[in-house]
A protein has these predicted regions:
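Catalytic or ion-coupling anion/metal-binding cores of large enzyme and transporter domains
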Residues: 1-4, 17-21, 54, 60-66, ...
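Long, structured ligand/cofactor-binding scaffold of large enzymes
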Residues: 1-72
Length: 287
């Protein structure tokens, strides 16, 4: 088991520290490559949650190219009054206008991050967790689970078992799963969730590690006829922890599946279409 430090963009924004943010993605990918190749493994499980950690892990996963499963680290709980981190700007503005007192501002600051997990809105971290699943590199339904849920630990253990299965039975590598069609699916999901624009930095970098080229024009072409479906902050009303309970990535894909490449492979060893059908039949959405 190896760890690599990550940074928090929320803490570095507005300071010179933000200049280190994108560089940290490269360092994470580099350290994954170093550890995986210095101590050879037959398979890997990668777990990350946040802005540069998720794309860094996906880049490293592609570079190492051993049978692998990615585990999204989940989303933070909402605070009292459904408070989430991106609302602090609103509270700060209200304080500056004299609409709330300092005590209320301090309350918001102290309650906006009540648990571990990615910030509870569709920022870069949430977007990239969703992209990992949309690419077929995470188990179905695992993106943006509440980080405090015991189900997340169960899925992490299942990811380990699945990594062993694909190593023993099929030796299926990330490069056998991810294709241009996989990236087109992910970009359509990105449109449907109104995902972070930072995805335009990260998906091309991940694609590059797979020897695939995508550009801003790729996003533009696919987004023009795409549907926006997700009512989650900052573009919508609800905290990101609601995403999982509404069906998560599979529910989004069901809504847009006529536009998706359903024959792409995933880490389950089955196609996307097979996964979606299996989830419907096994009561996933009712749960």
């Amino acid at each position: 088991r190896y760890h690599c430090t990550d940074i928090c963009d929320g803490e570095s924004q507005g300071t010179d520290g933000i200049n280190y943010s994108l560089a940290s993605r490269e360092m994470i990918a580099n350290m994954i490559e170093i550890h995986a190749n210095a101590t050879p493994f037959d398979a890997g499980v990668y777990l990350s949650s946040c802005d540069k950690g998720v794309p860094g892990n996906l880049m490293g996963l592609a570079r190492v190219n051993i049978p692998s499963v990615f585990v999204p680290g989940g989303t933070m709980n909402a605070g009292p009054e459904m408070l989430t981190l991106e609302q602090l700007g609103m509270y700060s503005a209200k304080f500056e206008r004299g609409e709330i007192n300092e005590e209320k501002l301090d309350w918001a600051k102290c309650n906006a991050c009540p648990s571990c997990g990615a910030c509870s809105f569709i920022g870069t971290a949430s977007t990239m967790q969703i992209m990992a699943e949309a690419l077929g590199l995470a188990l179905p339904g695992t993106a943006l689970m509440p980080a405090t849920s015991p189900d997340l630990l169960d899925f992490a253990r299942e990811a380990g078992r699945q990594a062993v299965r694909i190593a023993q039975m099929e030796n299926m590598r990330p490069s056998d799963i991810v294709t241009m069609d996989s990236f087109e699916n992910a970009i359509l999901v990105h449109a449907a969730i109104s995902g972070s624009t930072n995805c335009l930095l990260h998906l091309p970098a991940i694609a590059h590690e797979f020897g695939i080229e995508i550009t801003g024009d790729t996003f533009d072409k696919l987004h023009r006829n795409a549907r926006y479906l997700l009512d989650v902050r900052p573009a919508g009303r609800w905290p990101a922890e609601c995403f999982y309970y509404a069906g998560g990535v599979p529910a989004i894909m069901e809504e847009i599946k006529e536009h998706l490449h359903l024959d792409v492979m995933t880490v389950t060893g089955k196609t996307l279409g097979e996964n979606l059908e299996e989830l419907k039949n096994n009561g996933f959405y009712e749960k």
